[in-house]
Amino acid sequence: MCGILAVLGCSDDSQAKRVRVLELSRRLKHRGPDWSGLHQHGDNFLAHQRLAIVDPASGDQPLFNEDQSIIVTVNGEIFNHEELRKQLPNHKFRTGCDCDVIAHLYEEHGENFVDMLDGIFSFVLLDTRDNSFLVARDAIGVTSLYIGYGLDGSVWIASELKGLNDDCEHFELFPPGHLYSSKEKEFRRWYNPPWFSEAIPSAPYDPLALRQAFEKAIIKRLMTDVPFGVLLSGGLDSSLVASVTARYLADTKAAKQWGSKLHSFCVGLEGAPDLKAAREVADYIGTVHHEFQYTIQDGIDAIEDVIYHVETYDVTTIRAGTPMFLMSRKIKSLGVKMVLSGEGSDEIFAGYLYFHKAPNKEELHQETCSKIKALHKYDCLRANKSTYAWGLEARVPFLDKKFIDVAMGIDPENKMIKRDEGRIEKWVLRKAFDDEENPYLPKHILYRQKEQFSDGVGYGWIDGLKDHAAKHVTDKMMLNASNIYPFNTPNTKEAYYYRMIFERFFPQNSARLSVPGGASIACSTEKAIEWDAAWSNNLDPSGRAALGVHDSAYDDQLNKSVSKGVEPEKIIPKMEVSPLGVAILS
């Protein structure tokens, strides 16, 4: 994928404007260090910074149809491009790039082709025949995209805020699953799956169908002409991604080019839970494993860069984005340009620990729907921008459209957590891959308790961030926080510290409005806090704040509960010992 910037209808076709567009496009160069392109048609400019993954030799952008009347700049991967090419027998393609089909599909189907694309994408298409344009973003918002408006009536599109924040009067997130047509001058939702209405589904749980849908999502994402690997934290989601990838890699084109030995990557503080678990999974599935350790000071030193690149002041995004940012730099230094990652599973399968308190299947399902709809503001944004800061692409198979349809069609009663039956969080996913004859993972990894990435890299990480923020934000500053930051007022010193840095880079009102807010417990929505009255006094996005659920909850909070006579519950899933002998590293 890449970085895109478009300025449309700016009433200025001067050389000075072209130079300015080039200057702004270079702010996105980290997203695409392999090639730069700019096409101007009158007062319309389409710029592109390319990260070459498919057809690196000839897939430079912008892309065109045969007579160059249709111009496209794309940040994306179209996994079904070969199938789509077969549906366009009368068209001649200039490149082997997967995104080359977009201009030709538009010629055949007009604006109604977007749902035909199976992939992740953000694109701007300019039709020079009538000077109209079309902008679209993928279903869930895996790719990042913003839209802005100039005082001269121009429309601006950019992969990141920094491409347009200084030149637009107003800008905002481009909504995922939507397209914007200059002909209609409005947004239109193109992605309308059954689950989007939040009606309660009733399909029976079919573990084999779920497993097969996920395997297909993985296999299609092995489309690459460059070296790649998997992010492996040792948690359920990344471990399943790694296991399935390792199992099917040998039969792919990628294996013929780069070898059938999968590379895996993990990051953490010394002694972190994730490092140990990831090492064990890597040994079990046979990957070439790369382990990166960082110190709390390394992470603190990177905070400003992380906030600049990820473009948020959301606490949990920065906590998790920092180690991912550091790891991505190491991965890119090894010559790897694409990784598979495990984002999205917790939202789909009610995996966050606060779901233990869901009162019924209706509220659980509605919460999962809300979480998926908001992914583009949180985990998708983090995974996209913290990797692209170093020219590394992250693909997320759990957010495959067809897989989501299967997973979100399951009667949510099956996702309810029932400890007395051994059903812990994400039970339906764990059960689907609990294969006694041909195991995907060691049993205790398959049933490892949910650990948020910012916790799993080492419990000292969050504590270190809080201590550092306390040195820079005084009690007096906190008393005045609502006057300084009336929107999304920071309620902790850590949040205040991140907000100060963000405002320095992005001082515009539109920028601060682009970041989500609201109270949260262990990454919940504000609505879910009502599930447990005690949570309102313990608002922290860490999974360790899920008192009575997390096995390593904050010690001081546990002590308070015990002093009140409340015994924290431990989750002990019912499971059988794996028939395979697995060495547990100490």
Curated annotation (Swiss-Prot):
CDD domains: Asn_synthase_B_C, AsnB. Pathway: Amino-acid biosynthesis; L-asparagine biosynthesis; L-asparagine from L-aspartate (L-Gln route): step 1/1. Gene3D superfamilies: Glutamine Phosphoribosylpyrophosphate, subunit 1, domain 1, HUPs. Residues 2-185 form the Glutamine amidotransferase type-2 domain. It comes from Lotus japonicus. It holds the Pfam family Asn_synthase. Residues 193-516 form the Asparagine synthetase domain. GO terms for cellular component: cytosol. It comes from the Eukaryota. ATP binds at residues 231, 267, 341-342. The lineage of its organism: Eukaryota, Viridiplantae, Streptophyta, Embryophyta, Tracheophyta. This is Asparagine synthetase [glutamine-hydrolyzing] 2. One of its GO terms (biological process) is L-asparagine biosynthetic process. The gene is AS2. It catalyses: L-aspartate + L-glutamine + ATP + H2O = L-asparagine + L-glutamate + AMP + diphosphate + H(+). The keyword Signal does not apply. PANTHER family: ASPARAGINE SYNTHETASE (PTHR11772), ASPARAGINE SYNTHETASE [GLUTAMINE-HYDROLYZING] 1 (PTHR11772:SF48).
